[in-house]
């Protein structure tokens, strides 16, 4: 098979996914790695003449090899998803007539119970942040936004000031067809105003309204820095278990479901593609240990 041509199709597909479907950069990187693994596997098929000869048996063989390499079911499911959307793209563009992945289903797996923060833990995090400094106001706003909006860390860090509607307490995350409106708390609104004023005063001519969360150099806060500051505040708050930016998103999801929010509305707020992903919050609130934590949120 002409693998140079195959790799050309992959590049065209990745370009299409990033700039037409507006998938995130991290998603593109993951898909690229998955398709590179597929290319490597197919290169060992001696009798493969061209791309139209790729069969369901070959795709199943690829998945079997991944299983033998002890790839987890969740990762295996994601890799199959990457392969499926690639071949759908090829079929849509009439490069192939038959999609070899059409009859192949993703493996079922048990959804892990995500970490849910209690109101006590969130209050402890608030209490250890020094809001007398610009960086402290920034960090307090980060905590309030993550907790009350349910956005991802990537969405948080990409925010500019113009996407905020303070009067309606809503903001727009994402771009193009993948954009959505989410809402935030009154606390987040107040810390947004205080932080922006402090940022203007601190950075003066280096102040940039297109980047909300900045470091001491007035450049965009990185994902690594975000994780470090959450780790630092968790340690100061004497929270012994590991938490991450996603802990706030999971807390938001479970909290909304426990208060009767329609699951399809929650799906839209969280930006989930598949309703099954959102349904995990229905499952976790059934667990007694989680219910105990959620009860604290109501106090």
What is each model feature region?
Residues 1-299:
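Conserved catalytic core of the tyrosine transesterase superfamily
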